[in-house]
Amino acid sequence: MKFLNKDRVLCIGAHPDDVEYGMAGTFKKCYNTMFEVVVMSGGGDFDSTTTDVDRRGENELVWKMFDGNVKGYVFNKFVKNQDEDSMVNFIETNFNNFDLIVTTPNQDSHFEHRKINNLGPALCRRDLITLVEYRTPSTLNHWIPNHFEGLSKYDYEF
């Protein structure tokens, strides 16, 4: 099965585990779509309990749980220290030929998630690329998704 009938999807997250929380069921269900995850930081700069190496390792373990249709990259800067132009340039320079981009929603309590959401329209400006948002644990309750992928807990267990 394909996600929205797309071949290649770019998933952008602010931190390790953002995309995985919001998209893991879709990764499992839509095994005929290639998902590339770009994490724009190694983790929280005020989190003294883990390191960016720990967080990156966690992501890599999650990506391996899927049937080869998920690969990812973790950028080592903090989102708050990057301006939108440099993040857009980094993504456009290193990742291309996508049918769809997914980002965190603008209706999110975390400022770095909102910053990542702002990248979506800029990345879609040149090509006919669909933009979809995924839910995170910090997404506000009044957010309304522009797509909902139904999952059966019995069909997509890990």
Give the residues covered by each predicted segment.
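Residue-level detector of flexible, active-site-proximal loop/helix-junction positions
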Residues: 44, 79, 138-140, 155
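Active-site beta-strand->loop->alpha-helix modules in alpha/beta enzyme cores, enriched
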Residues: 1-16, 20-133
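A conserved mid-domain beta-alpha-beta active-site/ligand-binding segment of alpha/beta enzyme cores
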Residues: 149-158
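Short, flexible loop segments at boundaries between secondary-structure elements
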Residues: 128-145
